[in-house]
Amino acid sequence: MNRIGKVSRKTKETSISVEVNIDGKGQYKIDTGIGFLDHMLEQLSKHSLIDLKVKAKGDTHIDLHHTTEDTGIAIGEALKKALKDFKGIKRYAHAMIPMDETLTRVAIDVSNRPYLIWKVKLKVERLGEMDTELFKEWFQAFSQSAGITLHMENIYGDNSHHIIESCYKALARSLRIALEIDPRNKKSIPSTKGSL
């Protein structure tokens, strides 16, 4: 079974196309025009095993906010399309990911009830060309458009690159588990309500 979602999103600020394959192998082709964001999205694809294609063009002459946020929106929308009716998924997952001196914890509920808890403090204002405040914007946009409750907490760490990379990797590992088809519950929606 291939759960594939495609989204094209065009505004006066950005033009973005995204394709996800939840049942992929973690292959990616990513070009947002923002080097550090590309690196993080590569981690997301590789460690979730979700194939991810992203092509984004934005008003980066102003700043990177619109491209970062709209990329999160488009990836979330594509993921939600690929899930269709949420049938058979495990729904809940969590991961604790170390990266050298850093440890980050993520818990998710793929419930169509978007919410972000963000307990991450970065020690620098920029990583590469990105303002570090944009990472929260990306995760907020992603969780809202994907319909995912996302709790993200950096427990400790000193290096801001390691902290944010561990956030993307922990989300990736959580998605890998939560989006798997449960062999004991393949045809059922994981909710007593009967829908998500």
Swiss-Prot record:
InterPro entries, A to Z: IGPD_sf, ImidazoleglycerolP_deHydtase, ImidazoleglycerP_deHydtase_CS, Ribosomal_Su5_D2-typ_SF
Keywords for this protein: Amino-acid biosynthesis, Cytoplasm, Histidine biosynthesis, Lyase
Compartments reported by the entry: Cytoplasm
Catalytic activity annotation: D-erythro-1-(imidazol-4-yl)glycerol 3-phosphate = 3-(imidazol-4-yl)-2-oxopropyl phosphate + H2O
Pathway: Amino-acid biosynthesis; L-histidine biosynthesis; L-histidine from 5-phospho-alpha-D-ribose 1-diphosphate: step 6/9
Classification via Gene3D superfamilies: Imidazole glycerol phosphate dehydratase, domain 1
Pfam families reported in the protein's UniProt record: IGPD
Chief place of localization: cytoplasm
EC code: 4.2.1.19
GO terms under biological process: L-histidine biosynthetic process
GO MF annotation terms: imidazoleglycerol-phosphate dehydratase activity
GO cellular component, one term: cytoplasm
NCBIfam families listed in its UniProt record: PRK00951.1-5 (NF002109), PRK00951.2-1 (NF002111), PRK00951.2-4 (NF002114)
Family: Belongs to the imidazoleglycerol-phosphate dehydratase family.
Matching PANTHER family: IMIDAZOLEGLYCEROL-PHOSPHATE DEHYDRATASE (PTHR23133:SF2), IMIDAZOLEGLYCEROL-PHOSPHATE DEHYDRATASE HIS7 (PTHR23133)
Stated name of the protein: Imidazoleglycerol-phosphate dehydratase
Species per Swiss-Prot/TrEMBL record: Pelagibacter ubique (strain HTCC1062)
Annotated gene: hisB
